[in-house]
Structures are given as structure tokens and as C-alpha cells.
Amino acid sequence: MSTYLIGDIHGCLDELLALLAQVNFDPQQDTLWLTGDLVARGPASLDVLRYVRSLGPAVRMVLGNHDLHLLAVYAGISRNKPKDRITPLLDAPDADELINWLRRQPVLQVDDQLKLIMAHAGITPQWDIETAQMCAREVEAVLSSDSYPLFLDAMYGDMPNNWSPELTGLARLRFSTNALTRMRFCFPNGQLDMICKDTPENAPAPLKPWFDLPRLVDPEYSIIFGHWASLEGKGVPEGIYGLDTGCCWGGDLTLLRWEDKRYFTQRAFKAEAEINNNNGFAAGEEVQH
């Protein structure tokens, strides 16, 4: 029995299957953790969702900002952009079923036995584990409820960007969503910066990557995240693992086998990298909430 953690798939099904074949993944025995952004930009978002859903309890995933954007597009709140390449999913006969499954997936995973925490963007330095779990449960509750379109309509925006226990309602949900699915840089006090998308070495002062600030999360826990392809998994402190290595931009799909901390990679198939590059995508370009 092995625990495998994989970075952002972004509709790259062939690379996912090739990567899982490298480690002889067995859904009857193994557990697969996915950092979110299953969909968009790659060629096979529909088939990725079908495959991941078919794995049932073998999968522990979190939602990413592109997954949330898909939900908003399907609900008629946001516009379907051709570069996201999700039209086959939107038009699929099982789209309702897949969307209803997707919106019931978590935005945070915590395993107290393995001492693992996973969120698409990471954990804001303003939260301890208990606060992160509380805020994640609030987002998950509204996403799985009948009022989820109201939340999806309100999630777009960069404010508030500073955590306070006094936050309530949609403002609180928006902060939590941004912290869990969009965050990269923070100010020294932990306040989110939602503007800079650069690499850490090119970020203006006083911004720092969220993982370089003192954090409230128990240091016995490791944090797994995706979202930030331009990091290429490098430059993170001990106990922090960035697994998005930009497969849909022509990079790799990366897998970490937790038991021995061994990495496996599958290079993007050239045709898909060329399609995205020719469309003028910037590595790590994200949906704007």
C-alpha cells in the first residue's frame, strides 16, 4: 500500500495514466492524493474527471481555482473561454453528474496519521490547522448546498485579503477560497497579495511566498500544494512540497511517493505543449476570481 501525491493535472489524462503506470498504481491498494486543478488548458478535462471519479475512495483530492471556475461556468455565472478547452465537458451527457460530484469535493485534506495537509495553493500563515479546517468546511458546505451558485458568483474578487475571525458571510468565504486556491505571496503580516504571479526572486519587496513566512501550522505536519507551476517544485522549505511542475505548459506531471519521498515525473507530450504555447499562455496563468 502506497500513498501517491500528484500535482495539477489540467486535463492531461495521457500523462496522468503514464505516470501512474510508472509506479504500478493499484486503486485497490494505494491512495492517490491530487492537488486540484484537474481541468482546463489540457486536452482531456472530461476524461480526467471521469477517470478520477471512477477511482472512488482511492482518491483524496482538493479543488483548485480552475475547478471552481468550471463550476461557475457550468452554473452560467462565468464565461467559457476557448483557451480553457472545457467545451466537451460542458456538453457531455454526464456533465450534470460530474459537476455535482466535483462540487462535493473538499478544498482541504488533513491526515493526522500521516501528518499531511493538502490544499491547492497552500495554507495561509495566518491560520493554524484548526482554523484552516473550520474555514474549509464552511466553503465545502456551501459548495455542496443548493445555494452554491450564490457563492460561486460572489467568490470572484481579491478582497478581503486579511484574515480576521470577525469575517462573516460571503466575505469570509471569499477570503477562505482565495487563501486555499489562489494564494502565492503574502505581506510580512500574513496578509494576502493577490496581484503578483511572478517567481519569488522577481517579486517586489516586501512580498514573500506564503511558505517563507512564520506559520501557525504544527511543524510536525507537512504541507502539500500545487497551483504555482513556475516554482517547478523548487525553493520551498523542509516539510513543504510544491507539486505543480507545469505539465500543461510543456513541463512535467510530478508524483511524490510519500513512504520513501521518491519523485517520479512524466514529461508533457509535445503536441499539447505546443498547443498551449501557441495560444500564448503564460506558465502558471490562472483564472481571476
Curated annotation (Swiss-Prot):
Signal peptide: none annotated. Gene3D superfamilies: 3.60.21.10. InterPro entries: ApaH (IPR004617), Calcineurin-like_PHP_ApaH (IPR004843), Metallo-depent_PP-like (IPR029052). Keywords: Hydrolase. Its EC number is 3.6.1.41. CDD domains: MPP_ApaH. It catalyses: P(1),P(4)-bis(5'-adenosyl) tetraphosphate + H2O = 2 ADP + 2 H(+). The keyword Hydrolase applies. It is an enzyme of class 3 (hydrolase). GO terms for molecular function: bis(5'-nucleosyl)-tetraphosphatase (symmetrical) activity. The keyword Metal-binding does not apply. NCBIfam families: apaH, PRK00166.1. Hydrolyzes diadenosine 5',5'''-P1,P4-tetraphosphate to yield ADP. Belongs to the Ap4A hydrolase family. PANTHER family: CYTOCHROME C5 (PTHR40942:SF4), PTHR40942. This is Bis(5'-nucleosyl)-tetraphosphatase, symmetrical.
